[in-house]
From Swiss-Prot:
Domain of life: Archaea
GO BP terms in the entry: translation
Any one Gene Ontology molecular-function term assigned to this protein's record: structural constituent of ribosome
Disulfide partners: none
Source species of the chain: Methanocorpusculum labreanum (strain ATCC 43576 / DSM 4855 / Z)
Keywords attached to this entry: Ribonucleoprotein, Ribosomal protein
One Pfam family named in its UniProt record: Ribosomal_L21e
UniProt KW Cytoplasm keyword: no
Official protein name in the record: Large ribosomal subunit protein eL21
Classification via PANTHER family: 60S RIBOSOMAL PROTEIN L21 (PTHR20981)
GO annotations of cellular component type: ribonucleoprotein complex; ribosome
Family in the record: Belongs to the eukaryotic ribosomal protein eL21 family.
């Protein structure tokens, strides 16, 4: 069989939702706002494919740098490198305590 190298390979359990959280997200999750410099957690919502960053960033914490259209720009540390990730608000959760 041929080798498959899709962007969502090996994410069978990583992007799986629990029974209670299935379905589309709330409207408040879609229209949430953030301030520049605010810390956010990147938790991918598998029911929304639009604006979803690469699964390697799932569970990471980053800092809001700016806004691009409906999406937010985040700076995330990946080892020693600082990477800029573009994600929609459905995939972001504000950190409770800075």
């Amino acid at each position: 069989m041929a080798k498959h190298n899709g962007i969502k390979k090996r994410t069978r359990y990583k992007l799986q939702k629990t029974l209670r959280t299935r379905g589309m997200p709330n409207v408040t999750k879609v229209i949430q706002n953030f301030d520049e410099g605010q810390k956010v957690h990147l938790v991918l919502d598998s029911s929304v494919q639009k604006g979803q960053p690469h699964p390697r960033f799932h569970g990471k914490t980053g800092t809001i740098v700016g806004k691009r259209g409906r999406a937010w720009l985040l700076e995330i540390k990946d080892g020693n490198a600082t990477k800029t990730v573009i994600a929609r608000p459905q995939h972001l959760t504000a950190q409770k305590y800075n």
